[in-house]
Amino acid sequence: MIANGNGAGHRAGLDEPPGHASTSFRIDPDRAALVLVARSNAGPITFGATGIEGSISVHVAGGEVATHVPPAARLEVPVQRLTCGNGLYDAELLRRVDARLFPRAVVELQGASPIGATGRYHVEGVLTFHGVTRSMAGTVAVSFPEPGRMVIEGEQVLDMRHFEITPPAVAMLRIYPEVRVQLHLEADTAHP
């Protein structure tokens, strides 16, 4: 708690009076990555993609996201960039997710609330992948390592069947439907 001018306490950044402007951040595609860790009958297979684009609008106070002003974000993941380095596996994954027909996965933030004073937030939004839109919820860590830079990290387990995707199979290899998704984003203050 921090004492304000009238001697009353408030939580820095969380109970600021409404009306403060949000700060817009632009995701740096060179510093943003998505990692999918799929389990298979032959062990884990890791697919990754860079080049994530999008924007984030948040009110920052005291080095934290102040959620009294609802944050907003939209991320676009280029599905065709998903790769594990094995051409056969890559081709099968891109075929199963119909990457030519659905070249981007889109995440739209709809709400966030702090989890104590930990720098972690419960987030809710929608994910559109393979032409299917689903509500999602999870936890992300947010930090501001330097002025004008935001770092977001999160992890979530998704079932590909919820997006009408048949789990990939190549020869004797079978990939299980639940996939661990890890996200790392770095964003800089957007300048008009």
Role assignments for model-derived ranges:
Residues 1-192:
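Low-complexity, acidic/polar, glycine-enriched regions of mature
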